Amino acid sequence: MDRKQLANAIRALSMDGVQKANSGHPGAPMGMADIAEVLWRGHLNHNPSNPEWADRDRFVLSNGHGSMLIYSLLHLSGYELSIDDLKNFRQLHSKTPGHPEYGYAPGIETTTGPLGQGITNAVGMAMAEKALAAQFNKEGHDIVDHFTYVFMGDGCLMEGISHEACSLAGTLGLGKLIAFWDDNGISIDGHVEGWFSDDTPKRFEAYGWHVIPAVDGHNAEAINAAIEAAKADPRPTLICTKTIIGFGSPNKSGSHDCHGAPLGAEEIAATRKELGWEHGPFEIPQEVYAEWSAKEAGAAKEAAWNEKFAAYEAAYPELAAEFKRRVNGELPAQWEEKANQIIADLQANPANIASRKASQNALEAFGKMLPEFMGGSADLAPSNLTMWSGSKSLEASDFSGNYIHYGVREFGMTAIMNGIALHGGFVPYGATFLMFMEYARNAMRMAALMKVQNIQVYTHDSIGLGEDGPTHQPVEQIASLRLTPNMSTWRPCDQVESAVAWKLAIERKDGPSALIFSRQNLAQQPRSAEQVADIAKGGYILKDSDGKPELILIATGSEVELAVKAAEQLTAEGKKVRVVSMPATDTFDKQDAAYREAVLPSDVTARIAIEAGIADFWYKYVGFDGRIIGMTTFGESAPADQLFEMFGFTVENVVNTAKELLA
């Protein structure tokens, strides 16, 4: 069969899907159909009957607006994505949302749409493949050996994150990463020459990539030769494919008119004629399905791999068991028992240390149990304290380590970690100053949306960092993280809460965790075993009154000690004061109503929240009758103790505010 007709099946489904939805992007799928046909039918190792096969090649559509391309590919090659699913493109509760979403249709490796993040996720996947191979493969036993392929457009390359990710990919020699640039010269505003005139091949050569320029994106032989050359080269490869957006559309191809709008019934009819595609909307002939189906070949490839793995298992039974545990995302045996013992030991041996140091101590204790840890920092390891005694850096020539030097690339780091998490086999953690989570925010949002494990260590969490001033002092960042759905945000007050936060982040497989730590030393709080257990509920009574409280002080992180001291003074003056430590508001909010009422009785309306972050967040806990000691402006450059005094974070101010409230 003429392979052009196999590519035309993608074009037909794409224009039909967009037309039926009356919205979407037909241009990119029609332009990249020939490349997709060559890659998916000739090179991609995958099994539609088992989309979770551990050693499958990964495919990422970074230009996610062209989602009908991947939906068409999944449908045609035999995944559980029916023609009715394609007809439901962009409709409520369909498996085919406007941009590809992880967890909806089988075979979607990552959620894409925010441009540049797909290529960055792909870099993470390629890093995970190379690291797993270095950790598990033995001579004659290559059980981890697959490619990561990514399609991307001009928009991805204009986004700054593509520089962060592709620069690092070149440095680390990710030879199993192959990217296709859809060089069609068109974006939403029109022809890109006016705003995107980079010499992209030279740019990628400068990163240390293997670049194959000027490939005709509509010539199957040229595309195939480029892929073969890419697979043979030890460097990551950029294949520059010259394509015509909306290929086949007589009146709209090559222009922005077909980028982000349906072609219209008349133009679709003309396109069918132009392409020689004589079938109705959503009609695919049986012989086309037969040519496209990857079920038989995919099952054979997985069966061959299963044989390889059985031989590996016979030769290296312990490694094989560990590989299975890690790719299944299971924690080691005795994890719960050992982790709880570590936490109990910390409570029994008080230390007044910065919570960033407590975080490093937790890494040291837990890391010995977790070979799946893949740590890192955006060039702040000595400040974030993310390296521990077992940390070994990844290098291009040796990927057997467990620590990535991301360089000053906060956004790139976070989206790469999403790719590592999606690939499987690792628990990634990264780090920067809390202030600079702003650079990475959208990648954390994507982790929350995809429900993937991404642990971020955010240190230097308030005006407490002092002299560096307001450019580096976070104010609104904690609230911003807490307001993100499916984000778990922790701001611990001492080494015990810090270890609990780490334990829960390691156990949390269905979303990201933001662990927020101080630069300055924090006093350890005394607790009973029951109180230690209650930390995991996100908020608990740390210090209680004799009898029913008349005032509740709610605090987090460095301000918990302040609340305790103020409570002691108020108690000495005859007031009944309860102190609630609330390291994780989202976790507290998930507790049952009875527990929340026990901690914050609704009839005790005299409440003060104390946190060196934006004040407004706390009204939901203190009510309009309560008071908040927090930040309402940016900080200043000065020693931390002077700043805490200036902004009202003193025992005296808490006591005076309490007296006013109780008067």
Curated annotation (Swiss-Prot):
Question: Recorded GO terms, molecular function?
Answer: metal ion binding; transketolase activity
| Amino acids binding thiamine diphosphate | H65, G113, P114, L115, G155, N184, H259, F436
The gene that this protein is the product of is: tkt2
Task: Fetch the Pfam families from UniProt.
Answer: Transket_pyr (PF02779), Transketolase_C_1 (PF22613), Transketolase_N (PF00456)
Q: Which Gene3D superfamilies match?
A: 3.40.50.920, 3.40.50.970
Residues bound to Mg(2+): D154, N184, I186
GO BP terms in the entry: pentose-phosphate shunt
Record-stated family: Belongs to the transketolase family.
* Details of cofactor binding: Binds 1 Mg(2+) ion per subunit. Can also utilize other divalent metal cations, such as Ca(2+), Mn(2+) and Co(2+). Binds 1 thiamine pyrophosphate per subunit.
Catalytically driven reaction(s): D-sedoheptulose 7-phosphate + D-glyceraldehyde 3-phosphate = aldehydo-D-ribose 5-phosphate + D-xylulose 5-phosphate
Query: What is the required cofactor set for this protein?
Result: Mg(2+); Ca(2+); Mn(2+); Co(2+)
Site feature: Important for catalytic activity? H25, H259
Please give the GO cellular component terms listed in this UniProt entry: cytosol
| Complexes and interactors | Homodimer.
EC number, UniProt record: 2.2.1.1
Q: What is this protein called?
A: Transketolase 2
UniProt keywords, alphabetically = Calcium, Magnesium, Metal-binding, Thiamine pyrophosphate, Transferase
Per the Swiss-Prot or TrEMBL record, the active site comprises: E410
Q: Where does substrate bind?
A: H25, H259, R356, S383, H460, D468, R519
Q: What does this protein do?
A: Catalyzes the transfer of a two-carbon ketol group from a ketose donor to an aldose acceptor, via a covalent intermediate with the cofactor thiamine pyrophosphate.
